[in-house]
């Protein structure tokens, strides 16, 4: 086995300058996005997720109301509806992720 040759010293790291990374250009984001702006943008990108969340919350609220009133059959139906709405929301999230991944590849 051959002994490694002498290592040529590289330029020392200068902490005052960021390292150069190929394909990366640092930019300064001057306008940070607030909660309201981000919520509106995300809702426009994938409107089915908030719809699913509202459906889930509505089914849960009405199911608890029926449970409180003693309507156990209707309460059970609303809990099953809530599970379906949660499933719809998860599928909407996954489809939104898949669409954004395909958009970034193109």
UniProtKB/Swiss-Prot annotation:
Species of provenance: Mus musculus
Modification N-acetylalanine, positions: 2
Example GO biological process: mitochondrial respirasome assembly
Pfam families referenced in this protein's UniProt entry, alphabetically: HIG_1_N
Name of the protein in question: HIG1 domain family member 2A
HIG1 domain segment(s): 20-106
Family annotation (InterPro entries): Hypoxia_induced_domain, RCF1
Keyword RNA-binding: no
Keywords annotated in UniProt: Acetylation, Electron transport, Membrane, Mitochondrion, Mitochondrion inner membrane, Transmembrane, Transmembrane helix, Transport
This protein's GO CC annotations: mitochondrial inner membrane; mitochondrion; nucleus
Physiological role: Proposed subunit of cytochrome c oxidase (COX, complex IV), which is the terminal component of the mitochondrial respiratory chain that catalyzes the reduction of oxygen to water. May be involved in cytochrome c oxidase activity. May play a role in the assembly of respiratory supercomplexes.
Listed transmembrane segments: 47-67, 83-103
Intracellular or extracellular location(s): Mitochondrion membrane; Mitochondrion inner membrane
Bilayer topology: Multi-pass membrane protein
Subunit structure: Associates with cytochrome c oxidase (COX, complex IV); proposed complex component.
């Amino acid at each position: 086995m051959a002994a490694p040759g002498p290592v040529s010293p590289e330029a020392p790291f200068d902490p005052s300058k960021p390292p150069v990374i190929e394909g990366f250009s640092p930019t300064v984001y001057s306008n940070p996005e607030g909660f309201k702006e981000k919520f509106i943008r995300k809702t426009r990108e994938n409107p089915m997720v908030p719809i699913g969340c509202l459906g889930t919350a509505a089914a849960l609220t009405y199911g608890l109301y029926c449970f409180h009133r003693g309507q156990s059959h209707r309460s059970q139906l609303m809990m099953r509806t809530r599970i379906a709405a949660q499933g719809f929301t998860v599928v909407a999230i996954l489809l939104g992720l898949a669409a954004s991944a395909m958009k970034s590849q193109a």
